[in-house]
Amino acid sequence: MGQKVHPYGFRLGFNKPWRSRWFAKQGYAKLLQEDLELKAALRERLKSAGVSSIEVDRPGNKLRVTIRTSRPGIIIGRKGAEIEKLKQDMAKKTKREVFIDIQEVHKPELDAQLVSESIALQLEKRVAFRRAMRKAVDSALRFGCKGIKVRVSGRLNGAEIARSEWYLQGQLPLHTLRADIDYGFAEAHTTYGVIGIKAWLYKGEILDLTKRRNLLPEPEPRREQRRDRPDRRDRDGRGGDRDRGGDRGGYRGGDRGDRPPVQSAPPVEATGPAVQTPPSDLPRPAARPVAPILPPLMAPQQPSWKQEVRQDTPSAEGAPEAKPAADENNPGTEQKPEGSGENQ
């Protein structure tokens, strides 16, 4: 079953800033405890001032506190007397030089912390919880809020069993990281017990579509075709309507049965040199028959320059005819020409 994650911590570092900005190599726990005690004391002291958030910076050995409030006059006081007194008390407690900045919240109806605190204040004054919730929802939507959800949990109306009730108006995309969702929590201490109030406010997307388009790189301008140049398909019939298997010359296409047969060379033994054959798809003349290469032991002896080469060509006119070779079995006898007999 899905549970609700803290909307501020879920978006921390993405579109929400840290509320304590400092770094310490040693004594980190001591400084963190000092921040928590300082914020709790300020909220208790400025309870009627409508404090939304408190941010702490530590530049060097100094302390800078930023307070966002809907009633800055209560904190500053007449002629700045209250803020000076507050500054002296904080400096005495922290033993640091303290600077206080006051920021006014112009629309408290759109601040989740102030909305939850206003509902808690009404519940402590015995106002009906449904009426307080409906009033907060209507005022937030009237000031331009896109969505709001208010949840009240505890012994509502003094019931014996605690329960929860909530109102939701508008849209509330909790899974969208770019959504600007504010979250606040407050407690109402009544005679029947403690009632917890939670408020979610959706103010829109921080990175909208217009800003996202500006971040994208601009597309390259498309080149326009020159008017004096015809279209590619109209250039002398060389366009896309040509038949790639037609009369292109050679034997590239058409009927492959008209192609002259290519005489392949006989297989070459492993001892002979390798013969590279051209690709079969290129037109070439008929290959010459290659005589088989004999092994070195069976190759006929080549004549040297000292030996006389026997000519197999017919002799010239008037030259004596060669005598027929003798029989291998009877070297003393001569072969008789065909047609000659003993009785000739």
UniProtKB/Swiss-Prot annotation:
Residues 219-259, 335-344 have a biased composition (Basic and acidic residues). Belongs to the universal ribosomal protein uS3 family. It comes from Solibacter usitatus (strain Ellin6076). The keyword RNA-binding applies. GO terms for molecular function: mRNA binding; rRNA binding; structural constituent of ribosome. Residues 217-344 are annotated as: Disordered. One of its GO terms (cellular component) is cytosolic small ribosomal subunit. Keywords: Ribonucleoprotein, Ribosomal protein, RNA-binding, rRNA-binding. This is Small ribosomal subunit protein uS3. SMART domains: KH. Part of the 30S ribosomal subunit. Forms a tight complex with proteins S10 and S14. Residues 38-106 form the KH type-2 domain. One of its GO terms (biological process) is translation. Binds the lower part of the 30S subunit head. Binds mRNA in the 70S ribosome, positioning it for translation. NCBIfam families: rpsC_bact (TIGR01009). InterPro entries: KH_dom (IPR004087), KH_dom-like_a/b (IPR015946), KH_dom_type_2 (IPR004044), KH_sf_prok-type (IPR009019), Ribosomal_S3_C_sf (IPR036419), Ribosomal_uS3_bac-typ (IPR005704), Ribosomal_uS3_C (IPR001351), Ribosomal_uS3_CS (IPR018280). PANTHER family: 30S/40S RIBOSOMAL PROTEIN S3, SMALL RIBOSOMAL SUBUNIT PROTEIN US3C. It comes from the Bacteria.
